[in-house]
């Protein structure tokens, strides 16, 4: 293995593990994380996430519930696939699509002046230029991972 291919492999591993860990953490905050809330709010984590999704004022309530119940599980699976490296191209593409969708929704909310939690990792994560910069960077990393995973496939074909 040449030095440039070692570097690309190291970058690929770093990107997939970092993005995977972020997705697993994001899922955890929506599935099991007990966040501070007033004693009178007996809400489950998915119900708190549903409130964040509803804050975007984009979906009907039935769709909000569906998203709040399923998206964290999808994030968890994608995160674990990235960390393990299984189905890397598919996981990388799913990550880029998810982050692209999240980023578009956040830009829309920010442009409309909505002061709402982004829904990324808890209710204290209000959409701001900082969250846009962070999620834009994550999207760029996911797109780089897609390119690297496709490059890895084409290199494997050329060695046959």
Model-derived regions, located:
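Membrane-interface extramembranous regions
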Residues: 1-77, 84-160
